[in-house]
Curated annotation (Swiss-Prot):
Keywords: Chloroplast, Membrane, NAD, NADP, Plastid, Plastoquinone, Quinone, Thylakoid, Translocase, Transport. NCBIfam families: PRK06075.1 (NF004739), PRK07415.1 (NF005649). This is NAD(P)H-quinone oxidoreductase subunit H, chloroplastic. It comes from Trifolium subterraneum. Belongs to the complex I 49 kDa subunit family. The gene is ndhH. It is found in: Plastid, Chloroplast thylakoid membrane. GO terms for molecular function: NAD binding; oxidoreductase activity, acting on NAD(P)H, quinone or similar compound as acceptor; quinone binding. Its EC number is 7.1.1.-. One of its GO terms (cellular component) is chloroplast thylakoid membrane. The lineage of its organism: Eukaryota, Viridiplantae, Streptophyta, Embryophyta, Tracheophyta. HAMAP family: NDH1_NuoD. It comes from the Eukaryota. PANTHER family: NADH DEHYDROGENASE [UBIQUINONE] IRON-SULFUR PROTEIN 2, MITOCHONDRIAL, NADH-UBIQUINONE OXIDOREDUCTASE 49 KDA SUBUNIT. It is a peripheral membrane protein.
Amino acid sequence: MNVPARIKDLMIVNMGPQHPSMHGVLRLIVTLDGEDVVDCEPILGYLHRGMEKIAENRTIIQYLPYVTRWDYLATMFTEAITVNGPEQLGNIQVPKRASYIRVIMLELSRIASHLLWLGPFMADIGAQTPFFYIFRERELIYDLFEAATGMRMMHNYFRIGGVAADLPYGWIDKCFDFCNYFLTRVIEYQKLITRNPIFLERVEGVGVVGREEVLTWGLSGPMLRASGIQWDLRKVDNYECYDEFDWEVQWQKEGDSLARYLVRIGEMMESIKIIQQALEGIPGGPYENLEIRSFDREKEPEWNDFEYRFIGKKSSPTFELPKQELYVRVEAPKGELGIFLIGDHNGFPWRWKIRPPGFINLQILPQLVKRMKLADIMTILGSIDIIMGEVDR
């Protein structure tokens, strides 16, 4: 009988997929030498649902409700990328008012995502109080979403050529009130957290990623900007109408977990600046380009037959994707969210490839946790900010 050789005094531990610090169904096979991490192997795929294949069997309008299940904490960005691709393929113009509304919703969603990163991240490293504080502000954002879209999460608000509905009466004033209130809350977070000696002991110098490593691994978002690279797609690509607003790219040069925290705190402040400028300058006009809609009406049903009475009287809009290929991207809270889209003179995409920022950023985790302590795994993984619905798709 052959007895497999084993490394003496090493212990293999499974973290997840049920561990509360895994932020979803992530499993880590960790090899330990006492408290020191020798090796770490992430096991993905527990939340795989075949989102790319589903896209090839749905029209864009039919697929919109699915995309909100990728990153379910920042659903506006997955909706934006889903409509931006067909808009660019078909040269569809978005009304100015719709573009401003999109920017407001995207930045509110960015703040909500960063808040729900901050609370669990602080809980992972032992600070419970901020976990409860962030829900106070997050609920106000969800109230704004509910008033504008009808849903607190999974909004299904973006449409090809605009948005589903205009902003309701009084919504802009409510959003102004939230912006003024939220600035005071961010200052409270900074006083409570940033100079806390216990917090600094847990995050300073932990999970350092150098400038060259960031580029080699293809990292994006706060992971990239915390390592000294000022790269933000809102400035680089100027999609929607971000070039009309005055704001700064937030970045740090240390590349550790503290730097990633500071970048996200700064981004929330900048998002408020963008929202306030958009609210002040939002133009009138239509909220959707209805001219580009086409309807399949090959045969009108009789007024008294089964299809007319029970299946539905209203035909759904269809958009034919030209025979072209396109890569389109947006700056999501976690990094560069992109899709590679191939059209084929059909309402269905021939190929729909998703580039999730969380999946790319997660690849560097084994390198970061080696030679660190077991407790540092939670700090490093939390600072990366992943959502498994987006990672596994």
